[in-house]
Amino acid sequence: MPFLRHLALRCRDMERSRRFYEEVIGFKFVDYRPSRQGLDLSDGVNNITILQHSAVERPVFEEGNEYIHFGIIVEDLEAVWQRLHAWGAMFSRDDVKQRKPIDPHVLPPRSFKVLDPDGNVVDITGYREEWRGVELPALA
């Protein structure tokens, strides 16, 4: 069976994206790419490569119309929620399955959608069984 282990995201400001995914979401910084035009982050299993992109800004898509989005399971949903608020993140939807409008002042009980610095939709959940067929290692 194949295993997804890598995702690459183009960004307008590589260091800002690094701070978002490392300090706010909780990924670990691995290293810069040899060209210094990219960097790698990891959760220990999956790798996210952040690539500096100098093209004209792309439009931010409304949730549900984006080309791609991805989901992250976190150990402490409330802590991530608080860091996202401190960051000034834009929240998109309450509950990744029901996609209800969100009240950005009320922590959803299970999951939510947020935009990264480049407008990518990121599903955030504290529920380990959020996505069918996903088996996670035991928490340390």
Tell where the protein language model's regions lie, with residue ranges.
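N-terminal beta-strand motif that seeds the catalytic metal site of vicinal oxygen chelate
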Residues: 1-15, 68-70, 126-140
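Vicinal oxygen chelate
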Residues: 3-12, 40-42, 60-140
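Structural preference for long, well-ordered alpha-helical segments within the folded cores
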Residues: 19-20, 83, 118
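Exposed loop/turn and edge beta-strand positions of beta-sandwich/beta-sheet ligand-binding modules
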Residues: 35, 66, 105-108
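A short local loop/turn or secondary-structure capping micro-motif enriched for an aromatic residue
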Residues: 56-60, 130-133
